[in-house]
Amino acid sequence: AIDSCKADMTIFDSSGIEAWVTENNPKYANRIIKQLKAYAKAMHFDDSYDPYKAAYGSMPSHSAANSDIKQLYIDGHFCYAYKFGIVTNGLGIVRHISFYNKDFFDHHPEIILEKKSDSPEEDKSVHDARLLIPSLQDLFAAHPLLNPHTFLGDAAFDSAGLYKQLLSGSTFGTDSNGTGRHFQKAYIPLNYRAGLENKDYSVNQDGIPFCPNDPSLPLKPEGTSRLRSGVIRYKFSCPKVKWEKDASTGKYHRVCHCKNPCTSSPCGRMVYIYPEKDLRAYPGTLRGTTVWDNTYKIRTTVERSINQFKDSFGLAGRKTQNEKTLHADLLLAGITQLIV
C-alpha cells in the first residue's frame, strides 16, 4: 500500500541544467583561478585569501552567448546553467517543476534579484529562499485538490519570515470554508550560524528546554495539548521524575528524584512552550527527536529524482544552449517519471 504520510509531504529543491557554453569548459575557470593565485602570490596575500571564491566573484554573472544562462552553484560546483525548481512528495513522485526563466520572473515581480556576492553557497541559499514561496504558490494554484501538510527543505529556508509564510495565514489560498491554507509542519534544519533564543527558558540548539542546574540535561517532551482557545502548546518535564503509586490512595503521582532540584515542586520542573510564538524554533514538530530524524531523511527523495532526470533521462551533458529545448527536455523528463 502507498504510504499516505509520505504522499502528503511536499519537498522542494533546486538545481540547474548546464548549457553548452564556453564558460562551462574547465579550462575557462582554471585559467582565471591560476591568474588569481599568481596575483595573490605577487601581492603577498595571507592564507585567508581564497582564489576560488575570488574567481567566482570575478567571473561574469551570465554567459556571453546567452544572458539567460546564469552563473549558479549546483552539485558542489559553480557553472553556467538554466536554473529550475522541483517539488516532489515523500515517495519521490514529481508534483511540480518551475523553470526560472524570464516568464517566471515576469509572473512573480515580487522576487527581487540582487547582484551576487563572493560566496557561491550564500548566493544559492538566498536565491532558493526567495524562490520557494512563489514556486509553492504556483503548485497549489495549479493543483487545488492538493493540501499543504508537511514541508521538507534544507537549511537554506531557515528564516523566520519563511516559517511564518509556510505555517500560518493564507499563503497558499483558502479552502471552501474560507480558512487559510498553509503547512502544519515544516522539517527544516537550523542554520547554526543563527542559534535559537527563548526569553522565558534556556533552550538547546534543537529548541528543547534544559535543566537550569545542568545545561547538558534536556527536559523530556510529553507531547502536545490544545487549549480551549485552540492554541497548541508543548509540554516538557524533568527527566528525573518518575510516576509512583501512593499506597494509601492507590493513585499514581509524580516524584522527582533529582539530588539537586531546580524547583521546590515535588513534581519537578514542568515547562510549557507555545510554538506560535516562535515558529522557527517549533515548526509544528520538535527537532532532535527520533521522529524528526526519521522524517527528515525522506528529503533526499527529491535529490534522487533530480539525479534520475539528469542521469537516467539524459538532461546532463546536453550539447545545446537553447532555452526552449532544455525546458522541453526538463518537462518531458518529469512526464516520463510519472509514466514509468
What are these regions (language model features)?
Residues A65, Y234-G288:
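Long, low-complexity, polar/charged, intrinsically disordered or flexibly structured peripheral segments
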Residues T320-G334:
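Membrane-interface transmembrane-helix boundary segments in multi-pass integral membrane proteins
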Residues A155-S237:
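Active-site/pore-lining binding-face segments in mid-to-C-terminal subdomains
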Residues Y192, A316, A333-I335:
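Extended accessory and catalytic-adjacent subdomains in large enzymes
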Residues Q337-V340:
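Short glycine/serine- and small hydrophobic-enriched flexible loop segments
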Residues D128-L131, T301, S305, H327, ...:
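Catalytic-loop motifs flanking and including active-site residues across diverse enzymes
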Residues D200-C238, K242, P275-Q321:
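Short amphipathic alpha-helical "interface-anchor" segments enriched in bulky aromatics
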Residues A1-T150, A155-S168, F172:
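Polybasic low-complexity intrinsically disordered regions
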